[in-house]
Structures are given as structure tokens and as C-alpha cells.
Amino acid sequence: MIYNYLYLILITNFLILTIAFSLNLKLKNAGIVDVIWPLLFISNIGIITKTNPNLSLYQLVFLFIIFLTNLRLFIYLLIRFIKHHPNEDTRYTNFKSSFPKFPNLAIFFIYQFQGIFAAILFIPLIPALLTNKNTLGTIEILGIFIYLIALIGEFYADKQLSDFKSKNNDSLCNSGLWKYSRHPNYFFEWLNWVSYFIYGLNGNNGWLCIIPSLTMLILLTKITGIKPSEELMLKKRGQIYETYIKTTSAFIPLPPKSL
């Protein structure tokens, strides 16, 4: 059964990202894929819902928290994209410059890679999502509680940064949640995936739900999240950001250190 879902999800992601690539060509802005990213998970939820018409309470809650996370992220990223368009994210500009002879083909492949990666994150959740039970125990309640912390935390981290940037283009945001973590948005994004793991523990093969949370932890802290973001900020802010690094936790919100 999992193989059937894998096939459906990969095909769906491929089609969605092919449409996203067409939008990229029309808008001349590869950053549109960031807006599309949460829609991949929403479409995957649609597949589960469509193929399981009689969903249990456990399934409905699990699907809803994943849906709400990605709906919020979609709205936030769409607003951000509209605000900055036609300026393209430097990640994609730099990526295209690495392939001067075939930049569009390179972008197409990086889009499709994101579709595969989204499937890798979602597939381990499916056995738990297919668990048919109508009760929520202590573990599920704990998962929901952690999820609410993650949802609220990510919302405020994004809002605080957005509000700060609108008033202080040339300064460093180190107030609010950003006083306690250099990347609170990434931390709470990861906490979403932790909540899926906790909620799914008592589901079918619930231990598999740890795979996406560990994958996102590595991705955000070592590959596409903190690392490139801090390299850019060090170039832009120099000594100010070096001081921020010395006094403020990189990921987990902690009391600031004194120099």
C-alpha cells in the first residue's frame, strides 16, 4: 500500500513542480518554488483524504495539524514573494549562474529534487496517518501541545522579523524571539516536525515519524538553513553579526550570553 502512495505522491509532486517551473519562466523568478513548497504537503494530505473516505478522529487531527502548518507557511511565503517580486532570491540567482549554458534546465531539476525530498519527508508519516482509531491518548495530546507551541512560535518569529525589516532595513533583528535564538523561525519549523513524531508515536509504525524530524534538523542546522543564512549575514553585517553569534544561541532559544 505504501508503494501505491509513493507513486501517487511522486507523480503529484512532479506535476505541481512542473507547473511551478512554468510560472518561474513566466515571472522570471525562480523563488516561486518556495511558495509552492507547502502546497506539496497539502496535496499529499489531499491524496490521503481522497483514498480514505472514513477517517478516524486520530487521522483527522493528524491531517489537520499538517494542513494548518502548511497553509500558514503558504500564506506567509506568498505575501513575502509578492512583496519582493521581481527581485529574485540570491540562492536561485547564484545557482543559475553556476550553470550559464543551461540555467533553466538546472532550475527544472532543482525543482523536481524538491518534489522528491518532500516525498521523503511525507512518506514516513503515512503508516501513522492510516491508523484508524477514534481516541486520543496522552501522547497525542502532548503532540498537539508541542504543535501549538511550534505554530505560535513560528508565526511570531516570522512576524517579528518582517516588522523589524520594514522599519530597519540596515540593522540586525535581535529583539523578541530573535534575542534568544539567531534562527527562531527555523527552530519552530523543526518543532512542527517533532510534534508530528510525538503525535504519531502510537500510530502504525509510529517510530518512522522520527525520520522527517531528524532529516529537517540536519537540513536546517547543517545544509540549507543556518549555514548559508549566516554566511550571507556575516558578509552584510560583519562585526555586528559576529557579536550576535557570540551572544546568541544559533538554534534553540536560550538566554543570551554576556561578553
Locations of regions flagged by a protein language model:
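Hydrophobic transmembrane alpha-helices
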Residues: 5-17, 40-74, 79, 118-259
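Broad structural signal for hydrophobic residues in well-ordered alpha-helices, predominantly aliphatic
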Residues: 22-23, 95, 233, 244
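Short, hydrophobic transmembrane alpha-helix segments
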Residues: 1-4, 22-30, 48-54
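A broad structural signal for alpha-helix termini and local helix breaks/kinks
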Residues: 26-27, 99, 237, 248
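Transmembrane helix irregularities
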Residues: 26-27, 71, 112, 181
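Hydrophobic alpha-helical segments and helix pairs
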Residues: 70-125
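Juxtamembrane helix-capping/reentrant segments at transmembrane boundaries
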Residues: 27-43, 86-109, 171-178
